[in-house]
Every structure is written in structure tokens, then in C-alpha cells.
């Protein structure tokens, strides 16, 4: 992950405040290992509670949907995870990408199957609303498309997730972006709400068509 400190400006999206909070949260350095370890322990405990309370679900609505991105690649949704929770007060979309190390051919199918076991590593993070799991694209990159309640919470998760992904990913292939003020379903229904010019014109994270 590149250690970026600048915030990438976006066009104002529907429902977004017209101030600095409308800027995308771009990549920051990963969190320290000790912070990540504590966060993962809390997350695993919260995930177990959600499962016990039957508040975590695997909706089938979007499974099989194909997303085409501005960089010319496309990927299929192979799983969705959703959390029963209260109203989302500060919605945002988080998009993460990575490329697995030394995985080829049938290895991708095996990863998609076993990735269900990774649920305790993300399901209990504060603010999670939903996650769509996207299969590998033409360049071998996986993506996660999340809705989160709170951009800062989403960013904290992404910076913790980096440490986990780094264990199995090609160096330099892990990236994320947080898009404040946007709901995932809005993005799925109207991908044109995102700007099509400037840095976003050919961005790996910007959906341009849904089928």
C-alpha cells in the first residue's frame, strides 16, 4: 500500500455535505500490529455475538451480479454478508482490492469457498452494514464492496485489514478508498453518481456498469 496523506476530491454526491467531509478517504499507512491484534480479537467476539443473535445473514439478491469498473476490468459478486442493525446515520462506501500471492486456476475457486471462514476477521467491526465479495477480475484482483456507518470507522477497518491481507497478497496490490455520504445500493442502482473525470476516470474502484 502506498503511504498517501492527501485526500482525493470527489464531485458532490446526492446527500453529501458540500464541505471537506465530501472528500474521499484515500490510503493511509496500516495500523500498528498491536492495535490490529486488539481490533481483531474484539471483532471476533462481536461476530460470535451477531451469529448467536442471528443478526448476520447471507442475502442472495446480488450474488451473480457482474460489475464493470472504470479501468476496464469486471468481477462477479460471489457472496454477500449483511448485518441487522439500526438506521445508518453516516453512510459511506468502502472499496478494497488485493491480489493473492501464488494462487492460480482452481486455487481461486478454493479461495472463494474458504473465504467464508474469514468472516470473524471483519463481521464484528463497528459500523459494518454489508459486504459484497467480488471474485477475481481479469488481472487476478479481488475486491470487497462495503457499506459502512461512519467513514472513519471504515478507514480504521481498512487499515487493520491491510495487515491480514498482507500475509497472503502480492506486495503493493492492496488498496482501498472510502466514499463518504454514499450508500451501496445507490451505487449499485446508479453507478453514474460517481464522477467520470479526473482521477476517477479510469479508477479501479469506480463501477461504471452493473449487469
For each feature predicted by the language model, list its residue ranges.
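Short, non-transmembrane amphipathic alpha-helical segments
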Residues: 161-165
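A general secondary-structure junction signal
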Residues: 135-137, 178-182
Amino acid at each position: 500500500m502506498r503511504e498517501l496523506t492527501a485526500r482525493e476530491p470527489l464531485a458532490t454526491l446526492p446527500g453529501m455535505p458540500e464541505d471537506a467531509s465530501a472528500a474521499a478517504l484515500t490510503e493511509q499507512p496500516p495500523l500498528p500490529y498491536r492495535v490490529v491484534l486488539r481490533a481483531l480479537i474484539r471483532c471476533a467476539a462481536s461476530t460470535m455475538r451477531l451469529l448467536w443473535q442471528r443478526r448476520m445473514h447471507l442475502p442472495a439478491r446480488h450474488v451473480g451480479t457482474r460489475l464493470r469498473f472504470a479501468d476496464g476490468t469486471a468481477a462477479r459478486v460471489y457472496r454477500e454478508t449483511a448485518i441487522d442493525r439500526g438506521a445508518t446515520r453516516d453512510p459511506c462506501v468502502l472499496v478494497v482490492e488485493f491480489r493473492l500471492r501464488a494462487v492460480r486456476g482452481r486455487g481461486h475457486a478454493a479461495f472463494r469457498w474458504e473465504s467464508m471462514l474469514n468472516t470473524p476477521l471483519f463481521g464484528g467491526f463497528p459500523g459494518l452494514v454489508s459486504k459484497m465479495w467480488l471474485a477475481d477480475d481479469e488481472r487476478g484482483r479481488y475486491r470487497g464492496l462495503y457499506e459502512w456507518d461512519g467513514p472513519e470507522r471504515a478507514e480504521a477497518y481498512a487499515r487493520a485489514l491491510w495487515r491480514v491481507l498482507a500475509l497472503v497478497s502480492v506486495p503493493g496490490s492492496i488498496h482501498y478508498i472510502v466514499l463518504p455520504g454514499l450508500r451501496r445500493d445507490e451505487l449499485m442502482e446508479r453507478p453514474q453518481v460517481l464522477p467520470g473525470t479526473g482521477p476517477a476516470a479510469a479508477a479501479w474502484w469506480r463501477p461504471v456498469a452493473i449487469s
